[in-house]
Amino acid sequence: MTQAILALSQIEKAFPGVKALDKASLNVYPGRVMALMGENGAGKSTLMKVLTGIYSKDAGSIEYQGQPVSFKGPRDSQLAGISIIHQELNLIPQLTIAENIFLGREMTSPFGRILWDEMHRKADQLLARLNVKHSAKTLLGELSLGEQQMVEIAKALSFESKVIIMDEPTDALTDTETESLFNVINELREQGCGIVYISHRLKEIFEICDDITVLRDGKFIGECRVCDTNEDGLIEMMVGRKLEEQYPRIAAQQGDISLEVIGLTGSGVHDVSFTLKKGEILGVSGLMGAGRTELMKVIYGALPSERGVINLNGRTVNPVSPQDGLANGIAYISEDRKGDGLVLGLSVKENMSLCALDQLSKGVQIRHADEVIAVDDFIRLFNIKTPSREQIIGNLSGGNQQKVAIAKGLMTKPKVLILDEPTRGVDVGAKKEIYQLINQFKAEGMSIILVSSEMPEVLGMSDRILVMHEGRISGEFMASEADQEKLMACAVGRNPAHAA
């Protein structure tokens, strides 16, 4: 194989109480796409932070273009030709697209005047490469989250880097945007650029990558070519064990109807009716923009309803706020755990008990002993990997953050649990643990709504499935009668069906 343009060898990094990297290695080759795989907490992000100078390494070596290097920070590595596209956007909504792309390195004349026309022209060229249909003069805040992600990618391309690291680049992208990104990756590959591609989406790995490096518990497990492995082999490398069944659906005794929605209309939702039983998992499928999240937020009280009826255990309720929804026994775990679900600057304990303070209080005093007992019980039950309940949640891996978000909802002892994209950005090992928790709630008789963009997840975990299209229910199936073709037909509004 060609000599690596970038080689990280035997990297070690320790934090108080944890060894994040233990002889981790990564090779990046010119003109090839290297997938960096591993469960959340495997050390992928830490390794990238060591590379770009955010963290200093305790041991090991980094060679770039055959020379040993040690970068002082992201700016230093970027100027050397190594760019990283983070999962969390590093952009300013109040500035234009062009201003964001060239922030801190504006094009100027010899007299210091900013060359706006030249900047806009260059930015427009970058946007065209990514098939973004906006002028470079557009304010970033006017773009969708997926379009903002494409601007972040355009910013990295503007450095004409020799190595580009993409951390979950398609997480917020539509299928069309993903296709545009893959076209650019192929273009960069042909130009000899080395690319590190970090993703939990195995389908993407086998579609766009050439090589794979796997980390587990901070250790280098192996490097192989994509053509020499398969999904089962890759999963086994990542988790250290075989996953015999990805979706461990269980049979459980279903009870009476707990939730009945009749003719519900609200923000992005039109005349929706359905029922949900105790001990049932109701999957909700559909394409981006179909109204799935809007429907859940109307039921929960985060978005207003215009008309319709919501009955909970035979009693009509009308949640007008999230607090109202919680008080009525409805818990909603947001698809955006970092935006809506968690406060990243607070501890695990503070996040977990945030919505249950009424239950944990006597008068105006929080019963701290009861709070600690409840939080510790959930940490143990959910196998949350954290040094302590006082750990700042922003320091946890994505999978452990998601477990805390779910525990936060369960602390309120809900009758109905709504899980919106519960495994988004979560590795395969943590997914399995979350599925097992969902099954446990189901076995205990809880009513669960599972909203997911991953059709295999909906098919594998649900007892019954609703499909949404343009704010309406376009199909309903028993899981045993559904398949991806039927769900997709309903999702695009081509074949409305009601098989349940």
UniProtKB/Swiss-Prot annotation:
Principal localization reads membrane
Catalytic function, reaction form: D-ribose(out) + ATP + H2O = D-ribose(in) + ADP + phosphate + H(+)
User: Which GO-annotated molecular functions does the record name?
Assistant: ABC-type D-ribose transporter activity; ATP binding; ATP hydrolysis activity
Which compartments does it reside in? Cell inner membrane
The question of whether Chaperone is a record keyword is answered with no
**Listed InterPro entries:** AAA+_ATPase, ABC_carbohydrate_import_ATPase, ABC_transporter-like_ATP-bd, ABC_transporter-like_CS, P-loop_NTPase
Give membrane topology per the record.
Peripheral membrane protein
- Tell me if Translocase is a UniProt keyword of this record: yes
E.C. numbers: 7.5.2.7
Q: Where's the ABC transporter domain?
A: 6-242, 252-495
| Function (record text) | Part of the ABC transporter complex RbsABC involved in ribose import. Responsible for energy coupling to the transport system.
Its quaternary organisation is: The complex is composed of an ATP-binding protein (RbsA), two transmembrane proteins (RbsC) and a solute-binding protein (RbsB).
State the similarity comment: Belongs to the ABC transporter superfamily. Ribose importer (TC 3.A.1.2.1) family.
Stated name of the protein: Ribose import ATP-binding protein RbsA
Originating gene? rbsA
